[in-house]
C-alpha cells in the first residue's frame, strides 16, 4: 500500500466538497495554492463559469483531473429518452475537453426522479434495464471520444432517486455484460461511502481488477447520520475502515489519485482553506 504520510501528491479534491464556499475558479485557485494537484469537477460548476474558462483554469493551475461528475440518470419515459441520451453525450464531450480520465456515471433510479417530468413508475427491474441499455448506447459514443465510463454504485438508500445500481457486484455485472472481452473504456468509480457496508466488497474489489477500477473516492460514515445526502463525514471522523479498503484497491495495482468527496452541511459552513487543509491532514494520517 502506498505511503501517503509524507505529502499529498496523490490527493484529489472533488469540487463538491467546497461547492458552497466559492465557484469553480475559486476552488481551482485554492487547490493550486494548497498544493493539491488534482480535482474532479461537477458539470453544474463548469457550466456556471463556462467550459472554456474551466478548461483554461485547470490548465493554467497545472492541475489534473481524477474524474468528471457526472453522466447517467438514464431511466426516463419515452418523452424524455432523447433528453437523457443527448445530455450524456454532452457530458462525454465536456469530460474530453477537460482531459478527464473518466466520466463518472450516477445511473439514476426510477424515471420520475432521474428525469423529472417522466411518468411515475415503481418498476425497479425496468429501471435496471434502462440503465444497462443507456450505458450500452453511451459506451459506443464514449469509446469514439476516448472517454472511459465509470459506473458508481450508490448506497441502497438512493435506489429510488439517484442510482439503482447499489453494489460493486451489480456494477461489475453490467461491465461484464457490456464489455465481456474487457476491451476497456468501462469500469467503476468506487466510493467508500456507498460500499463500505457490503459483505461482498473485498471479493468485488478482487473481481474488479486494475482495468475496471477507474476512480477511488473517500470520506467517512458518521453515526448517527443526520441527513441522507448532506452529512458525509471527514475521513477519520466515522466508522469506515479506510486503510483496509484502500489496501485492497491498491493491491490491484491502482496507482491514481485518492479523491475526497464530501457532501456536508457542516463542512460547507466552514472556510474553504480550513476544509482543504483538513482534507490534506486527514489524507496523510487516516486515509
Regions found by a protein language model. Give the residues of each.
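Conserved beta-strand positions in the central sheet of alpha/beta enzyme cores
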Residues: 40, 67-69, 104, 150, ...
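Active-site mouth loops of central-metabolism enzymes
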Residues: 10-23, 72-85, 121-127
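Glycine-rich, proline-tolerant flexible connector loops at the mouths of alpha/beta enzymes
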Residues: 38-59, 110-114, 158-159
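Active-site-proximal loop/turn and secondary-structure-junction residues that shape catalytic pockets
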Residues: 17-19, 43-47, 71-73, 107-111, ...
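Histidine-acidic metal/acid-base catalytic patches
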Residues: 1-35, 99-100, 115, 136, ...
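N-terminal substrate-binding region of glycoside hydrolase catalytic domains
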Residues: 28-47, 69-73
